[in-house]
Design a protein with these regions (language model features):
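Mobile genetic element proteins and their domesticated derivatives, centered on retroelements
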Residues: 10, 35-38, 75, 89, ...
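Short alpha-helical "recognition helix" segments of helix-turn-helix
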Residues: 21-28, 89
Length: 299
């Protein structure tokens, strides 16, 4: 719908007759149908009479339907139970026989003060997401500073399961191996490991001469795990792990949904349906880890 100022401009210019209809429409950036509709409706009226008529007219579009109170209570309850976003909550309620769009869910959450608004609008990414087909085919790992300590996360690429994590005073190869050993003993041995060129994972060459492998590289080699290195200065390669770091920090420091990393990891793996998985079945990373396991790997 055009603003009051533009409508007044259309009517005034059409009445004066100095410009053609096409020129007026181009100046006001109005379509042909919009131009003639406003001319028919407001022809001969002054700015103040147009404002008065607009104030008395009904807003365009269908009137919004009132959301039943039981639906509103169900939305708030799901949010408190699962900490999920509007799309996942809408899917959950549809499974329970409550038909409600994710837009209405978002509106209810926003009115209840349960939406964490972004300080800056994020632009759509231009690259295409990639992922492995089977669980244990590829794990990603990285370090991040969190509350004065170093946090490491190991993520299964296919299922988005957080296979291991640890919080340490320093980011070292030994601590990386410790967390990886625990993850392997719990979930199994991956075929490949994706890391950056960080010193904890890779011994870079010095002055053009090849360096000897560090402890992490030797551990991967001894366990038959293929080491895949991300491109230099390209954090998107390990973007899934970076996203997990953001999730942990946001849920603890901004939204205050949880108080510890362990709580966030349990919620991510066992409770929250992941939007990159089978959302129609509200699949969690733990469920996807079992479903995507290769038949030769299953016990």
């Amino acid at each position: 719908m055009l603003s009051l100022r533009k409508i007044s401009f259309l009517v005034r210019q059409h009445r004066e007759g100095e410009l053609s209809a096409l020129q007026i429409r181009k100046l006001a950036k109005a379509s042909k149908s919009t131009f003639y509709r406003h001319i028919r409706q407001f022809a001969g009226l002054s700015y103040y009479k147009i404002r008065k008529r607009l104030a008395q007219s009904k807003p365009p579009g269908r009137p919004a339907k009132q959301i039943p109170m039981r639906h509103a209570r169900a939305v708030i309850q799901k949010r408190l139970e699962t900490k999920a976003n509007d799309r996942i909550i809408a899917k959950m309620l549809q499974k329970e026989g409550i038909k409600i769009s994710h837009c209405k869910v978002y509106s209810l959450l926003k009115s209840a003060g349960m939406v964490c608004m972004l300080s800056k609008r994020r632009n759509r990414k231009k690259w295409v997401r990639w992922q492995r087909k089977h669980s244990l085919s590829l794990w990603q790992t990285d370090w991040s500073l969190f509350r004065g300590k170093w946090l490491i996360v190991i993520l299964d690429d296919a299922s988005r399961l957080i296979a291991g994590w640890g919080l340490f005073d320093s980011a070292t190869s030994e601590n990386s191996i410790k967390v990886l050993k625990e993850a392997i003993s719990t979930h199994g041995r991956p075929k490949a490991m994706l890391t950056g060129h960080d010193v904890q994972f890779y011994a870079s060459s010095k002055k053009g001469k090849p360096s000897s492998k560090n402890a992490f590289q030797l551990f991967l080699e001894a366990n038959g795990i293929n080491h895949i290195l991300a491109r230099v200065n390209h954090p998107q390669t390990c973007g899934k792990v970076e996203r997990i770091f953001g999730e942990i920090k946001t849920r603890i420091e901004r939204r205050h949904d949880f108080s510890t990393v362990d709580e966030v990891v349990s919620w991510h793996n066992e409770i929250k349906p992941h939007m990159s998985l089978n959302l129609d079945e509200l699949e969690t990373p733990a469920q996807a880890f079992q479903r995507k396991m290769h038949h030769k790997t299953k016990v």
